Amino acid sequence: MSSRREIRWGNARIYASQNNTIITITDITGAEIISKASGGMVVKADREKPSPYAAMLAANKAANDAFDKGISAIHIKVRAQGGYGSKTPGPGAQPAIRALARAGFIIGRIEDVTPLPHDTIRRPGGRRGRRV
């Protein structure tokens, strides 16, 4: 008999904003969350939440939980804030992807799923802006 292990696929969703990085690993359908971690869960100070180091630690934490539950391969979906917010992922996106790759996962595809408006979107605050 061959000693090949069974490959179980999952989705890793990385939401990287300017304020935090959230990593969620789900099964392939997306119906069940297998593990979840964020930059705020692994560092003490609030100012360190968006840092690349916090994203790396959060990705390692989520990866270890997913490995324990049997996930061995992932598709990565990266998302920025989108809409009227930033359309480029925050500083934690790249280190999170790198940490998931180094954790030993087989990586299928990496895609950007940031919601982009096709015309424009009205910013909050109304016509005269936010009055402070």
Curated annotation (Swiss-Prot):
Keyword Ribosomal protein attached: yes
Disulfide bond is among the record's keywords: no
Gene Ontology process terms (BP): translation
GO molecular function, one term: structural constituent of ribosome
SUPFAM superfamilies attached to this UniProt entry: Translational machinery components
Record-level GO cellular component terms: ribonucleoprotein complex; ribosome
A Pfam family of this chain: Ribosomal_S11
Gene3D superfamilies linked: Ribosomal protein S11
Keywords annotated in UniProt: Ribonucleoprotein, Ribosomal protein, RNA-binding, rRNA-binding
Domain of life: Archaea
InterPro entries assigned: Ribosomal_uS11 (IPR001971), Ribosomal_uS11_archaeal (IPR019961), Ribosomal_uS11_CS (IPR018102), Ribosomal_uS11_sf (IPR036967)
Function according to Swiss-Prot or TrEMBL: Located on the platform of the 30S subunit.
Similarity comment: family membership: Belongs to the universal ribosomal protein uS11 family.
Subunit structure as annotated in this protein's UniProt entry: Part of the 30S ribosomal subunit.
Matches recorded under PANTHER family: 40S RIBOSOMAL PROTEIN S14/30S RIBOSOMAL PROTEIN S11
Protein name: Small ribosomal subunit protein uS11
UniProt gene name: rps11
